[in-house]
């Protein structure tokens, strides 16, 4: 049912309100798992006393466990929104969650600003008390970034569901029932491959970070050898070259994942048909939601554990 208003004119309002409420709850869950005030991050800090291996293990555990509650909230919101207003209700839930977009973007930019402030304080050789203040601000910034990612992930999941239904209606014969039958091997194969795509993109991006970091390390070693007095604080390092390495690496390495994400569904549609693409969209959406929540919360918790 596309827009079956079960509760009359109030149906879209109820669905949009559910989107707002679910966004707030998902943000609170992200804060619990990433803020240094709560047990998950404190456990990672305790594990760090035993070595790097336990720190990584505990952080992975926190990230994985943090996926469950947001997905339950998203599932309940999706079901209730559909029950009161059909697929239009799911779209309205996405609109409700996106109503926070100005606040979430502002909150998300707080983290990098406070982090850079700490870097400036350290490079300017300010008093240790200044660095302590910026560290606390940076910790808050990590948490707010995780909260902002929660809103973005939730609204993106609702939007993806709405777009998926639009795709289904585009190829479904007129008058027939809208459905994706998972006994169809093409749909199942598409879902399996779609579930692997977010991991492929994530792997490519992580490898890109490693490549840029390797170039950065080589550049830092070169400067230590060729510019005497850096370690003693008598000479200034060449910051510009390091910044160019990181920015150029980020821009260049994003090209291939972006191209693949665009052409893969198109080529799959021409080769295997719309049912395969439908399964691909479902698998990629479900996998991407969980992977995004996991990586966002695990990274925020690790970053705050060192505070």
At which residue positions do the language-model features occur?
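Hydrophobic packing and interface segments
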Residues: 1-307
